[in-house]
């Protein structure tokens, strides 16, 4: 199954939107792309939002029809993650699992916090840098539970099935064996990355421990079930999420016409980024 992208506007601008297409027709990366690429083999589809070593805070938007990828804003300004020494930008290919939802109406029994109202985040640790809008097939290795401003924010650790090391990685202990330092750096990065913006250090459930593959698969299944309730209109409050889709004919928000309402591609050259985004921040107590 091949997916392509349709870009509108220039990166690093408020006008930028990136729609995902299947067979040339826009689909929702939140709802239309299947979670499983191969359920029997436990291979998942992951939508890449932010390529490794980049700074722009790109995300699947929840409020717009067909959920294009846009750059997040705060007070009308584009958001960029800071460079926290010794890291540059995001340290993984960062993205999300389609057809998952961290329900903000439900408190998780172990984290004691509600879901963050987003699809489940994925940290892809393979050697190849992805691109925004790429649909990767990944195998799950483990999971961390970030507690982000009082909400549970799961971070699944996964690897592209085409990575040379993928055949050797089967569970979370293999990450430390073949990627020594990766889990420690991941924990550090998520703890400190908001500090340069004046926010406190993030906290983790489970004392920052990465849970194993079985635990991760259970969380993915739970959030997939939550998404099913969401897309079928079975939750009392959908929190403003656009549920419009172009393939799920048994859902109340199915709309074949929605694809034709997406503007034609109008890509523009990337807009320049302010030099301040390159600054390195040195965080006391890190590393």
Curated annotation (Swiss-Prot):
Main location: cytoplasm
Amino acids binding Mg(2+) 2: 121
The reaction(s) this protein catalyses: diphosphate + H2O = 2 phosphate + H(+)
Domain of life, source organism: Eukaryota
Keywords, in A-Z order: Cytoplasm, Hydrolase, Magnesium, Metal-binding
Gene Ontology MF: a single term: inorganic diphosphate phosphatase activity
InterPro entries given in the database record: Pyrophosphatase, Pyrophosphatase_sf
Ligand binding (Mg(2+) 1): 116, 121, 153
Cell location: Cytoplasm
GO terms of biological process kind: phosphate-containing compound metabolic process
Gene Ontology cellular component terms for the protein in this record: cytoplasm
Binding, diphosphate: 79
EC number: 3.6.1.1
Needed co-factor(s): Mg(2+)
Pfam family of the protein (one): Pyrophosphatase
UniProt record similarity statement: Belongs to the PPase family.
Entry protein name: Inorganic pyrophosphatase
Species this chain originates from: Zygosaccharomyces bailii
Upper classification of the organism: Eukaryota, Fungi, Dikarya, Ascomycota, Saccharomycotina
